[in-house]
């Protein structure tokens, strides 16, 4: 088989670079408000993509971490309720109960569904006390929260593929929660600052997974408010 000619290699690299540039376009800004939305089941896919982010850390040893994180905001949860109620044929009463539970959950904590894969399976241990990973949530002011819980979730494959399709046969799924600080807790404007950053840090580096509001003040302006 003939080797690829130099011009072919250059063209291939150019195409790869162009594709990479397109795939790394900035995600759309989101709406952190509690606006009520009339989502249909067919809206779920686009809403899911809007609230899901992807980040990857690569070193000489391979992929240190690759993660797909979905922030379970009230906007996302409304689309989830619509899709879940449609799939499982919920009554109006059961749907209303589910919607209220989702609203209460969104007000109690910042919750993320995260699918993670690593080159070496033993690195994928975010939930362990001995894990080298430090997981934190930051906002536009630089305020930081530690997680209330990090749990490995083993969901039925048909369910997870339908509701969190970023999963693959190589990923491990986590539910990561950060409780909203009470009135006497540390100041954390959170989504009100216009930005949330889910950070995964280890000795080899870190990834920041970011959600920005459609319009928000700068970090300096937020800190001065």
Which residues make up each language-model segment?
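Bacterial N-terminal signal peptides that target proteins for export
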Residues: 1-11
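C-terminal motif of bacterial Sec signal peptides marking the signal peptidase cleavage site
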Residues: 18-21
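Conserved functional micro-motifs across diverse proteins
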Residues: 23-225
